[in-house]
């Protein structure tokens, strides 16, 4: 396993031909947008590419990813995208990875070549720099995917890890024709993973409380009914 500079990774990616890009379980916009943008970029320079993961692409992103057709590939080179640990890769956890690209400092995925940029607000910031180093022409479709990835991971630039580079990346993608307004509107009310988990916990607690209250009420009603129906004996 070797950590490499982004320039080195760009050179290495251009040397090989068949790629399988694997995103993490319970995929979010950043891993999906980054994976499909990289796939489009590799295909644009003559490479064969397939994007996959244990979970399907979320419905919210299908309209953007459906334009990226997968190639039939034998013996592909595996690329792990935006996955901080092997277990995040799900059923692909035990695959052999040649490349790993991520922005999580504690990344533990084993790969021949790794590039980790912990200061990046989203993996898409890294992908944009990488494909430019590869000499890829950034099309509107690529820009849309990367902008979607950026706004979902930064929650429309509201997270603490949103940086100056995040805004510069957004401006650059706008220059490439990204649908800033449309993608922004569709992702305006994104919730953080922590908030979603909290809401799920509260929902379960609420349902449990309602169930417990209903069960208690039924028990009290039953007890009253039994008491009222007991035979009365005169003395």
Regions found by a protein language model. Name each.
Residues 2-60, 71-76, 152-235:
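Hydrophobic helix-and-loop "lid/oligomerization" segment in the mid-to-C-terminal part
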Residues 3-10, 81-82, 131-133:
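Short, motif-level signal for alpha-helix interfacial/capping segments enriched in acidic residues
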Residues 38-39, 95-98, 116-117, 168:
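Glycine-rich, phosphate-binding/catalytic loops in enzymes
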Residues 49-51, 98, 146:
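Hydrophobic/aromatic residues located in beta-strands of well-ordered beta-sheets
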